[in-house]
Regions:
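Generic hydrophobic/aromatic pocket-lining and core-packing "Φ" positions
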Residues: 38, 106, 187, 252, ...
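Short beta-strand elements
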Residues: 67, 77-80, 107, 469, ...
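Catalytic, metal-anchored helix/loop core of enzyme active sites in primary metabolism
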Residues: 170, 413-418, 423-426, 441, ...
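Rossmann-fold NAD(P)-binding glycine/threonine-rich loop
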Residues: 339-352, 361-388, 393-401
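Substrate-binding/catalytic subdomain of NAD(P)-dependent oxidoreductase enzymes
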Residues: 428-429, 436-550
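C-terminal catalytic "cap/lid" subdomain
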Residues: 1-235
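N-terminal glycine-/serine-/threonine-rich beta1-alpha1-beta2 phosphate-ribose binding loop
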Residues: 238-244, 248-351
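Rossmann-like NAD(P)H-binding beta-loop-alpha module
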Residues: 379-382, 386-445, 455, 459, ...
Length: 596
C-alpha cells in the first residue's frame, strides 16, 4: 500500500512496483514482502503478484522490472517508516580532509554486529550522522567512543552525540530521478507544517529519500506527505471550532452547505476535526460527520448543540491539549467566542503551526505587545493569524488596508461608523420615538448587548479603531484613544436597573437637539477617527454633503484616505453586524488560509 493503513486511513494499494522499489520499501518497514525473497525472482525476471487473502477479487500489486510512473503519473510509489530510530553523530574539526575516519566508524560498528540504515554527511566533513535501531544505540555509542578515545582525549573530536525518540521516513520511487522538484516539495510540505528534519540522505540512484524526525511527529509527517503526494486532487484543511453560538452556528451551516461545492470546484476538503462549546467538546482527527446532525437532509445546528450536550466534558486545558496534541497537518483554530481565556491560547497554537481565525476581538485589541507578538509568531511559523471580522463583520476592511500598505501606500486618515447598534439608535430616534425607546428597541432586536451601556460607552468602537490603527501601521492602545461620552458618566456607574429607570430623563435634551439638527439638515453619527496618528471616538453632527449622512439602519462605513486615495478617499460600506455576514467573513478567512 502507499503507506501503513494503521497510521493513514487514506492509504490505498499500489498497482505496480519495480523490484528495486519493493526492496526499498521492505527495508524501511513494509512487512508484506521479505527482502531476501526478491533477489532470486529478480535475476530471473519473474513477476511477483501480491494479493489480499481476505479480498482475493482485488487487483493486488504486481512487482516487475518496469520502473515507470504509476497510472496517475506519480513518481513516488510509497512511504515507509521505522519508528524506533536513534541517531549518533560523530563530529570534530579533525575529521575534515582526514582519510579513513568513516572506514573506522563502519568497521567498528560491523565488528560489533551493529547494522546502520541511514548515513548523513555534509560536504564539510565536520560530522557524520548514523541512524540505527534503538536497541543498538547504547552499544554503538560505547564502541565508537572507545575507537576514537585518543582523538576525544586530545580534543580533536567530540564524544558521540546520541539522540533518541526519533523516527526515520523514506519516500520511494524509481522515477524520482526523472521528476525535478520532489525533494523541494517534500521538505517544503514538512516545513509548512512545522516539522523539522533532523537528518536526511539520498542515494545517487534517487530511488529513496530518507530523513529523520522526532518520533512524536511521525504520524503527522506521514499524513502530510501522503496528502501532498498521493491525494493532491484534494487539499485538506482541518478546522477546530470553538463557540457555536449565533456566529459559530451560522459558520457550520455555511460550511456544511458549501462543502461538496468546494470539493468539486476548488478541490478543497474542509474537515471539522473539533467542536467545543461551553463545557463540552467533540474531537475526531478523521473529521466529524456533520451529516450525522441533519434534519430532513439539511444540517441542523440545533441538533448538533443537543448532541454536544451529551459529549465528553471539556475545559480550557483540555481544549488546548487536544488541539495541539492531535498534531494534525494543515490545521486552523477558529474562535467564535468573546472569551479572553480562549484568546489566551492563540500564541501556543501559532507556535505549533496551527493557524488562527478569530471573530473574537479580544486578542487583536489587547495590549500592543501581545498583538505584535501574535503577528510575529504567525510570521515566523509560516501560518496565519486572521481577524477580518473584528471590524465590520464581513466587510473587507482589514484586508483592504493590508493590501494598500503591502503595495506601498500609506494610510493618512480613517473616518468610520463602526457600531451598528449606535447607528441604529441614531437613525431610529425621531419626534415619535425618543432616545430611551430607541435604546430599548436596539436591545430587543438583538443589536445591543444585554447591558446596552457597553455599546453606549463606545468601548466596542474603541477596540475596533485600535485594531484598524495597528493594521494601518500605528502603535496604539485603547487608553490612547480620546473618548467623548454623549450621556453622563453617572449612567455608567449605577446598576442596570437604575440605568433603565433614569434613561428617559435624557429624552428631552436629545429631542431638543434633534429638532435643531433637523432644521439644519444634520444627523448624528458616532464617528471613529484616526488622523495624524491620533485616535478619537465621539458623537458628531454631519450635514447632507458628508458621506456618513445617508448611512442607513445598522450599516457600517469607513473612509480611507491614503497618499494615493487622497482627494477622493476609498469608501467601504455595508452590513457591519449580523451572524450570517460575520460567519461569512470568518469563512472567507478560512478560505484564504487554504489558499496559502
Amino acid at each position: 500500500m502507499t503507506a501503513d493503513p494503521r497510521v493513514i486511513n487514506t492509504a490505498y494499494p499500489i498497482d505496480t512496483l519495480s523490484y528495486v522499489e519493493a526492496t526499498e520499501l521492505c527495508n524501511f518497514g513494509a512487512k508484506v514482502v521479505y527482502p531476501p525473497t526478491i533477489y532470486p525472482v529478480c535475476i530471473k525476471n519473474i513477476p511477483i503478484l501480491i494479493k489480499n487473502t481476505f479480498r482475493p477479487e482485488d487487483k493486488g500489486t504486481i512487482i516487475t522490472n518496469d520502473n515507470g510512473c504509476d497510472e496517475n503519473g506519480r513518481a513516488i510509489k510509497g512511504i515507509s517508516s521505522i519508528n524506533n530510530t536513534s541517531l549518533i553523530t560523530v563530529s570534530g574539526l579533525s575529521m575534515v580532509g582526514v582519510i579513513g575516519v568513516n572506514q573506522r566508524i563502519f568497521t567498528t560498528l560491523a565488528a560489533n554486529g551493529i547494522s546502520v540504515f541511514l548515513v548523513s554527511q555534509a560536504s564539510s566533513e565536520n560530522s557524520t550522522s548514523i541512524g540505527m535501531r534503538d536497541e543498538d544505540a547504547e552499544r554503538a555509542c560505547e564502541v565508537l567512543n572507545q575507537e576514537f578515545a585518543k582523538e576525544i582525549e586530545m580534543g580533536a573530536m567530540y564524544k558521540m552525540k546520541l539522540e533518541r525518540e526519533l523516527a526515520t521516513i523514506a519516500i520511494v520511487g524509481e522515477n524520482m530521478k526523472h521528476t525535478p522538484g520532489i525533494a523541494g516539495k517534500l521538505f517544503g510540505t514538512l516545513g509548512r507544517n512545522g516539522i523539522s528534519v533532523i537528518a536526511c540522505a539520498q542515494g545517487a540512484s534517487e530511488t529513496n529519500i530518507s530523513f529523520v524526525v522526532e518520533r512524536k511527529l511521525l504520524r503527522k509527517s506521514l499524513n502530510v506527505i501522503h496528502d501532498s503526494f498521493f491525494l493532491s486532487e484534494y487539499q485538506v484543511l482541518n478546522v477546530f471550532l470553538c463557540g457555536i453560538g449565533t456566529v459559530g452556528g451560522s459558520l457550520l451551516e455555511q460550511i456544511a452547505g458549501q462543502r461538496q461545492q468546494l470539493m468539486k470546484e476548488r478541490n478543497l476538503q474542509i474537515n471539522i476535526v473539533g467542536i467545543a462549546s461551553g463545557h463540552n467538546a467533540i474531537f475526531n482527527r478523521n473529521g466529524i460527520e456533520l451529516s450525522a446532525y441533519e434534519d430532513n437532509g439539511t444540517f441542523s445546528i440545533a441538533k448538533l448543540r443537543d448532541g454536544l450536550k451529551q459529549a465528553d466534558p471539556s475545559d480550557l486545558n483540555h481544549l488546548h491539549d487536544e488541539v495541539i496534541g492531535m498534531n494534525i497537518f494543515n490545521s486552523v483554530f477558529v474562535d467564535c467566542t468573546a472569551s479572553a481565556d480562549v484568546a489566551g491560547l492563540y500564541e501556543d497554537f501559532l507556535s505549533n503551526n496551527i493557524s488562527v481565525v478569530a471573530a473574537n476581538k479580544v486578542a487583536a485589541s489587547s495590549d500592543y505587545e501581545n498583538y505584535a507578538r501574535l503577528k510575529e509568531t504567525a510570521r515566523k511559523r509560516g501560518v496565519k493569524y486572521l481577524f477580518e471580522t473584528n471590524v465590520g463583520a464581513g466587510l473587507p476592511i482589514i484586508n483592504t488596508i493590508n493590501d494598500l500598505i503591502n503595495s506601498g501606500d500609506k494610510i493618512l486618515k480613517l473616518e468610520a461608523v463602526l457600531s451598528g447598534t449606535l447607528n441604529f439608535i441614531f437613525n431610529t430616534i425621531s419626534a415619535d420615538i425618543p432616545f430611551s425607546q430607541t435604546v430599548r428597541m436596539a436591545k430587543e432586536e438583538g443589536y445591543a448587548e444585554p447591558d446596552p451601556r457597553v455599546d453606549l460607552s463606545g468601548k466596542d468602537v474603541i477596540r475596533k479603531l485600535v485594531i484598524l490603527s495597528r493594521e494601518a501601521g500605528y502603535r496604539m492602545n485603547q487608553e490612547d484613544v480620546e473618548k467623548h461620552l454623549f450621556i453622563p458618566q453617572s449612567f455608567f456607574d449605577g446598576s442596570l436597573e437604575d440605568f433603565w429607570k433614569n434613561l428617559p430623563s435624557l429624552d428631552a435634551s436629545f429631542e431638543a437637539e434633534r429638532k435643531q439638527m433637523e432644521a439644519s439638515h444634520q444627523r448624528w453619527r458616532f464617528v471613529a477617527k484616526l488622523e495624524h496618528g491620533k485616535g478619537s471616538v465621539k458623537l458628531e453632527k454631519v450635514d447632507e454633503h458628508h458621506p456618513l449622512y445617508d448611512l442607513e439602519g445598522s450599516n457600517n462605513i469607513i473612509l480611507i484616505t491614503t497618499e494615493r486615495y487622497n482627494q477622493y478617499p476609498m469608501l467601504i460600506q455595508g452590513y457591519g453586524a449580523g451572524a450570517s455576514v460575520t460567519a461569512a467573513g470568518v469563512f472567507a478567512d478560512i478560505m484564504s488560509i487554504a489558499n496559502i
